[in-house]
């Protein structure tokens, strides 16, 4: 089997297994909660299966479309995504939950435009950086406009507020700046400005300060800000090597909040043990490895940048989610790709998967023979 075909098989295989794990674990983690709140133990899994079906169709669509021809629409696509971010902030238009205004409600389903923005921004930046390759380090013509677009996008996400998504988007685009060949002096200036800005954003809001304190000292307030991460620790710790058994989690019994969304990895660790949790990590490593093989063998610079942005996005989201669950990072509120309940995120993941498959179908770049 040729290298690109192998990479494509690994990419699709790992993604399909992760999706299957997600279906099983969402039902396991949410059944009791959904019966208590909705009167139907299958409420969340039924909705998730709808998203899986739609996501599968979107993945097939993204894997077969002429994405290079779509480049001429990169700016309108990004403009639409930014417009949706503006509209979602309008009271009575965007749906507000827990003080955050991030969703549209459509026919009983929620749509989060920031998930669409992630794909749109990566697509636009890949096109922009490829078009500007001859003047890549021109401050006025290339660097500042790119930073302006990133600033507008991240700024609107911050207004929702959603710091985790804003940071993730910024990290991915920084990777693209680096890969495209931005001068090191510009990259250092960006880092120098970004670090204090991030520190300010993390400390400016009381609830974010509490999350930082809970990250360092969760046991100082075990019934308050430290409660969620402590329950995550208890879930992971009680799972041991082989787990307590599928469906037998104690932490999902109203102890661990967001057990079927942001903290589903903890339930995996509890029910399937270290073996199950490690298997999920290995599947993500396989997915990322296969994605990077596709990126390095991509036919042209645009495809390389697009693929790198997409695989970086899924990589960062997986690392951050797992990092939060094991206490290595402060609570961020990001879902685990392909596994967590969350329709908009799943649809974005499947579109990214489809585009990566699409890129893998092209002939390899010169210098990377299929031998």
Name the predicted role of every residue range.
Residues 1, 321-371:
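A juxtamembrane structural motif centered on a specific transmembrane helix
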Residues 260-261, 265-269, 343-351:
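Hydrophobic alpha-helical transmembrane segments and immediately flanking/interface helices
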Residues 1-16:
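N-terminal membrane topogenic signal
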Residues 31-32, 259, 315:
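Transmembrane-helix terminus/interface motifs of multi-pass secondary transporters
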Residues 12-20, 24-28, 37-228, 266-324, ...:
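Hydrophobic alpha-helical transmembrane segments of multi-pass inner membrane proteins, especially
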Residues 214, 218-265, 272-276:
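TM-adjacent membrane-interface loops and short helices in multi-pass inner/ER membrane proteins
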Residues 107-117, 159-161, 240-245, 334-348:
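Glycine/serine-rich anion-binding loops at beta->alpha junctions
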Residues 28-31, 249, 340:
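Short linear Ser/Thr-Pro motifs
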